[in-house]
């Protein structure tokens, strides 16, 4: 399920009182799974929401487990990290194992990720597209995942996009959910974003945000 289009469907079902009693879980894929979309899907359908990460050319690469950890699919690919920064975030490379007709060797999938090596295994955090990363005023790279974490405890947002203004500051445009967040509820997200970006962030409530030509939505856009 595409998380953004799935969120719109969930809100439609909520307004119409539609229920799916046989539904056991929701698997999201195709684009970045935001905490705001996940919150709405879980609220409306009342089931766990899992993230399946991959691409058309590689197949599935990572699957979220019940603990919220993104685990590697060892049967389909090997994953490597390249050019990691001080936060451990770097370019994700994949070598496919399941496509005999078009194998990919150390393929740059175009995403940023972070590898966490644990005593019981390795998991990953997918940080979003490389081209969608922002730059803070102090020159640091700020990823889509880092931006999205600012909305973890902020209810009332259905969808958003953060992008820089011509003056170097940033503007957060968001679509309200169920009346939308008031200024007090939105303040923690704004404070978190300003701490990340080291500059002021203006906010604007909008009725809609358009997708790219591909049909995907950009939560962050440089």
Identify the residue ranges that each predicted region occupies.
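Active-site glycine/GP-rich loop and adjacent strand/helix microenvironment
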Residues: 1-222
């Amino acid at each position: 399920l595409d998380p953004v289009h799935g969120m719109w469907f969930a809100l439609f079902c909520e307004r119409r009182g539609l229920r799916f009693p046989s539904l056991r879980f929701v698997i999201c894929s195709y684009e970045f799974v935001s905490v705001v979309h996940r919150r709405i899907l879980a609220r409306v359908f009342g089931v766990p929401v899992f993230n399946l990460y991959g691409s058309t050319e590689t197949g599935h690469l990572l699957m979220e487990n019940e603990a919220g950890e993104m685990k590697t699919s060892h049967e389909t690919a090997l994953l490597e990290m390249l050019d990691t920064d001080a936060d451990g975030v770097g370019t994700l490379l994949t070598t496919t194992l399941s496509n005999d007709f078009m194998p990919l060797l150390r393929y740059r999938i175009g995403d940023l990720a972070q590898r966490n090596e644990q005593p019981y295994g390795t998991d990953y955090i997918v940080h979003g597209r490389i081209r969608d990363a922002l730059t803070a005023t102090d020159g640091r790279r700020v990823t889509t995942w880092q931006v999205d974490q600012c909305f973890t405890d902020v209810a009332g947002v259905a969808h958003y996009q953060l992008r820089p203004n011509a003056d170097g500051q940033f503007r957060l445009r968001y679509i309200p959910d169920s009346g939308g967040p008031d200024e007090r509820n939105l303040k923690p997200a704004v404070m978190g974003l300003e701490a990340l970006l080291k500059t002021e962030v203006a906010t604007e409530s909008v009725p809609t945000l358009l997708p790219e030509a591909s049909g995907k939505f950009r939560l962050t856009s440089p």
